[in-house]
Each structure stands twice: as structure tokens, then as C-alpha cells.
């Protein structure tokens, strides 16, 4: 059973016909993502799953404006992310996050768990460093 946490149907993130191709040689390209459409609404959580190498990380990097798209459009709160200023990119990344396939490899083993969890909050001025 899916519980609807939203108070309305506010569209937060939308991908339209999102495609990413990589040039692998002079005459060949590899299509990592092909015409993907996605609509995310306020209060919802989404997990992207698939086989290794199917384009999950590429797709998510495009959504976070970390990877240029080959074609298509991405809108965050109704605005085209390709036209975002640096401040708008920074703001959007406070709300769009990615957990890698092996999250254990992403953590610094020399940091305490509390420090790992609070670091992004401190970086985004959501928590004061004590």
C-alpha cells in the first residue's frame, strides 16, 4: 500500500524525453538513456533500480544537473534547469539527492556516523556546527 504524503499534486521535478548519448568512437555513439519521461510530485519518494550499466547513475546525474543532456528537458519547480544560475543549482541540490549502489563506499570510515549525517546539513546552512 502506498501512502500519499502530499497535500496537493504539486509537480516538483519533471523530465521530458531525456536522452544521453556518449561518443565512443569517431562514428559511433552509445545511448545510455533514451527518451525518459518522469514526473515527481511533492511528498513522494522515488527509487531508481536496474541492472548494472543500464544508465541509472547517468539519469540521476542529469536530473541533478551534474551531467549535460543530449536532448530533452528537465524542470525543477517549473523552471528549466539548463537555464539555472549557480545559486539555483545549489538550491536544487539541497532537495535532490542520490545514494549510490554501494553507499558504504561513499562514507568516510574515519568519520563518526553523526558527522556523516550532519555534514550536508551544515554545508547547506540547515544546522550550525558546534
Residue map of PLM features:
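ABC ATPase NBD coupling module
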Residues: 26-27, 81-97, 123
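ABC nucleotide-binding domain signature
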Residues: 47, 90-101, 115
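The feature captures the beta-strand-to-loop junction immediately N-terminal to the Walker
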Residues: 49-51
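Helix-to-loop junction immediately C-terminal to a conserved catalytic motif
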Residues: 64
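Short helical segment in ABC ATPase nucleotide-binding domains corresponding to the A-loop/adjacent helical element
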Residues: 104, 110-123
Amino acid at each position: 500500500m502506498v501512502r500519499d504524503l502530499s497535500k496537493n499534486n504539486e509537480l516538483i521535478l519533471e523530465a521530458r524525453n531525456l536522452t544521453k548519448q556518449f561518443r565512443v568512437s569517431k562514428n559511433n555513439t552509445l545511448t545510455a538513456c533514451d527518451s525518459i519521461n518522469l514526473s515527481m510530485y511533492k511528498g513522494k519518494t522515488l527509487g531508481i533500480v536496474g541492472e548494472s550499466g543500464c544508465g541509472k547513475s547517468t539519469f540521476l546525474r542529469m536530473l541533478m544537473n551534474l551531467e549535460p543532456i543530449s536532448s530533452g528537458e528537465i524542470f525543477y519547480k517549473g523552471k528549466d534547469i539548463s537555464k539555472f544560475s549557480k545559486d539555483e543549482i545549489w538550491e536544487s541540490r539541497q532537495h535532490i539527492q542520490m545514494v549510490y549502489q554501494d553507499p558504504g563506499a561513499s562514507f568516510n570510515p574515519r568519520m563518526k556516523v553523526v558527522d556523516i549525517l550532519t555534514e550536508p546539513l551544515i554545508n547547506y546552512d540547515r544546522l550550525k556546527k558546534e
